[in-house]
Amino acid sequence: MGEHWALGPEAGSSLLLCSALLAVGCALGLRLGRGRSAVERWVLAWLCYDSLVHFVLEGAFVYLSIVGNVADSQGLIASLWKEYGKADTRWLYSDPTVVSLEILTVVLDGLLALVLIYAIVKEKYYRHFVQIVLCVCELYGCWMTFFPEWLVGSPSLNTSSWLYLWVYLVFFNGLWVLIPGLLLWQSWVELKKRDSQEANLAKKHK
């Protein structure tokens, strides 16, 4: 029982690195969102963290997977992916589906997150269009990462440990389902409100 609940040094350092990126992302987002509503400030905090994860962590994963593989690599970020690879071995040996999705995620989702940050800060008219596209891309990425694996019986997934199942697989991946889902809802509500305002304005001018 104690062994299943043990948190080793590799797991500790990986979680510490993720926490550091979260702290930096929140600090950047809250600073960029000064003078805005609490909701918008936390949206910016998430987007800053999101872009850091895409470029720093996933960007490094793509590089390591193209020049070799994570299992044979050294360094802090390689150690993080080795730790995650204990829960999903596809990340250790350059699984072509995972690497293909991650290339798309780094390039497209990372850039969209930066464009969305700019659109929010500068109050651009295309903000919610970009937000919807980014959220759909991230939800698609989660779907294509896990559903093909589940359809063949999840041979690469290790759910024997609470850490691997609930923290690595469910929590960390679930964030990119829950928050994009909430942001899609935010865009829906905002676009619906704008449409109602335009309809009311048109009625007044008739």
Swiss-Prot record:
Transmembrane residue ranges: 10-30, 42-62, 101-121, 165-185
InterPro entries linked to this entry: EBP (IPR007905), EXPERA (IPR033118)
Role, per record: Does not possess sterol isomerase activity and does not bind sigma ligands.
GO molecular function: cholestenol delta-isomerase activity
Gene: Ebpl
GO biological process: sterol metabolic process
Lineage: Eukaryota, Metazoa, Chordata, Craniata, Vertebrata
Record organism: Mus musculus (Mouse)
Protein name: Emopamil-binding protein-like
Bilayer topology term: Multi-pass membrane protein
Taxonomic superkingdom: Eukaryota
Protein family membership: Belongs to the EBP family.
Pfam families on file: EBP
Residue ranges annotated for the EXPERA domain, each copy included: 39-184
Ribosomal protein as UniProt keyword: no
Quaternary structure annotation from Swiss-Prot or TrEMBL: Homodimer.
Keyword annotations: Endoplasmic reticulum, Membrane, Transmembrane, Transmembrane helix
Location in or out of the cell: Endoplasmic reticulum membrane
GO cellular component: endoplasmic reticulum membrane
